[in-house]
């Protein structure tokens, strides 16, 4: 479960485990005195809690382990690693009850110590909801990313979609690199598994030269690079504005003072930089991961691909789809939804933190607990989405089937932490998916004998997940369709 960059002395860990175990033991009477019990969960060891449960499977695909726990213990599950308390929410109802209806106390973030050491305290994704700057960030993002404001970014989205199509036409084998055109630095801070410092914050005082302190050297390396990356949007926008010939973007809009004057008067250039950097560094992950999943899914389901292309041809026979075709292509919109349901980009989201003791369904939820919504479990719940393992966009279209909720209620987060760019992401995915289907046919790869090769479905591990490299064929549907690229 834990990063093994190097090993700290066993005696050092023994002292730390003993210290945090005592903290946990002292806090126990407070919970028992209230007369409520903690949510059920796997049995714990006296000092280390559930550290032993975080096996290889829990490390690589924790959402599956947590889903199995929910089948054994119910939709609300409690576990502990040392003194770190965690509450899992494994159903849509529970997640909405707590993270939406009680968002006033469930919208904080637990301290991400690797981020703190790398100078990421003010990151939009990590900032505490108790900080005044948190509200300003939310207002800035809502000001620049609401559906009305997002219309001004359509030229940029169209330009990016055309670059993607040209890349696929020129080198279809490199489709993954054409899709991924955003930085990957932030993911290195979280790593493929948590670092010890996330469970033992006292390790932040260990000097970087100390054996086992490789995590500190990682933050010293990545922190400055992330800061440089976040300087790109404002510097680029300022250069474009100076020429007088620029496409409006989130950054240029705010640098020029467009939008809500009250919000802009309260913000500084650093505030704008942090918000723009969040979109640049992290915001693209949703689009990138979803597009990779989309390529795989349409390769595996030629019938769905054919139906989508027939719809596109009927609406845009002699041109590429645009944003204006959004309402006319409900099946493409359904493909966007089903892709994000079947393959949620962040299966566990980013943890929340409850800022005071709470009671839910007679369960005691301790102040300071991490609260994790198991988005994968929610979007694969049989009671919400019958036959959840099937990729079936028609489940969101009118028909003689049970109503199935819009997965956007879950996959973009909850409450005050809901992704403010959800609408922008949906429009970007719609445009890219529709454009790819308009021009190309995607199918399974074949071997030298012409026999189809089943693509291997494997995922990276982290806060956001991506499909590992897989093989497929991407070819123009015809010369006429290829000519749509101009």
Question: How would you name each of these model-derived features?
Answer:
Residues 2-122, 132, 136, 158-163, ...:
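N-terminal membrane-proximal hinge/A-helix region immediately C-terminal to the signal-anchor transmembrane segment
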Residues 187, 222-233, 260-311, 339, ...:
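Central I-helix of cytochrome P450 enzymes
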Residues 323, 397-429, 455-461:
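Cytochrome P450 heme-thiolate "Cys pocket" and heme-binding signature region
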Residues 1-6, 20, 465-486:
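C-terminal helix/juxtamembrane-tail motif
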Residues 53-67, 72-74, 202-206, 225-228, ...:
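Conserved cytochrome P450 K-helix E-x-x-R motif and the immediately C-terminal K′/meander segment
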Residues 302-305, 422-463, 475:
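Cytochrome P450 heme-binding "Cys pocket" and the immediately downstream C-terminal segment
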Residues 43-67, 85, 112-236, 252-256, ...:
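Cytochrome P450 catalytic-domain helical core, especially the substrate-recognition surface
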Residues 357, 373-400:
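Conserved cytochrome P450 K-helix/beta-meander segment immediately N-terminal to the heme-binding cysteine loop
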């Amino acid at each position: 479960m834990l990063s093994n960059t190097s090993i700290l002395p066993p005696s050092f860990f023994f002292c730390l485990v003993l210290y945090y175990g005592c903290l946990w033991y002292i806090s126990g009477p407070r919970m028992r005195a209230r007369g409520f019990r903690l949510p059920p969960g796997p049995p714990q060891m006296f000092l280390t809690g559930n550290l032993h449960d975080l096996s290889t499977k829990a490390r690589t695909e924790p959402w599956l382990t947590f889903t199995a726990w929910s089948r054994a213990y119910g939709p609300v599950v409690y576990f502990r690693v040392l003194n770190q308390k965690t509450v899992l929410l494994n159903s849509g109802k529970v997640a909405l009850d707590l993270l939406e209806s009680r968002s006033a106390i469930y919208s904080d973030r637990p301290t991400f110590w690797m981020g703190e050491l790398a100078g990421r305290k003010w990151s939009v994704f990590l900032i505490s909801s108790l900080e005044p700057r948190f509200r300003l960030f939310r207002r800035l993002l809502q000001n620049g990313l609401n559906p009305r404001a997002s219309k001004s970014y359509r030229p940029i989205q169209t330009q990016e979609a055309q670059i993607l199509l040209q890349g696929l036409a020129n080198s279809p084998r490199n489709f993954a690199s054409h899709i991924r055109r955003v930085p990957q630095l932030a993911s290195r801070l979280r790593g493929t598994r948590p670092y010890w410092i996330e469970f033992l914050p006292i390790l932040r005082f260990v000097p970087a030269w100390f054996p086992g302190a490789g995590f500190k050297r990682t933050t010293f390396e990545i922190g400055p690079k992330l800061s440089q990356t976040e300087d790109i949007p404002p510097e680029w926008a300022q250069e474009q504005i100076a020429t007088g010939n620029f496409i409006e973007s989130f950054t240029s809009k705010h640098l020029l003072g467009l939008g809500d004057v009250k919000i802009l008067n309260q913000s500084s250039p650093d505030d704008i930089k942090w918000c723009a950097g969040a979109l640049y560094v992290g915001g693209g992950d949703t689009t990138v991961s979803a597009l990779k999943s989309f390529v795989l899914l349409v390769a595996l389901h030629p019938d769905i691909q054919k139906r989508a292309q027939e719809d596109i041809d009927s609406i845009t026979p002699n041109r590429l789809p645009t944003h204006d075709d959004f309402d006319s292509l409900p099946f493409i919109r359904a493909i966007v939804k089903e892709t994000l349901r079947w393959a949620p980009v962040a299966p566990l989201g980013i943890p929340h933190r409850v800022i005071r003791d709470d009671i839910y369904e007679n369960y005691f939820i301790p102040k300071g607990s991490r609260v994790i919504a198991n988005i994968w479990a929610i979007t694969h719940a049989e009671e919400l989405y019958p036959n959840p393992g099937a990729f079936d966009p028609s489940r969101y279209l009118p028909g003689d089937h049970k109503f199935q909720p819009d997965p956007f209620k879950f996959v973009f987060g909850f409450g005050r932490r809901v992704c403010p760019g959800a609408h922008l992401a949906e429009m970007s995915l719609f445009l890219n998916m529709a454009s790819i289907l308009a021009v190309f046919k995607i199918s399974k790869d074949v071997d030298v004998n012409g026999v189809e090769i089943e693509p291997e479905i494997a995922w990276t591990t982290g806060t956001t997940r991506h499909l590992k490299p897989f093989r497929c064929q991407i070819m123009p549907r015809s010369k006429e369709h290829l000519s749509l690229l101009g």
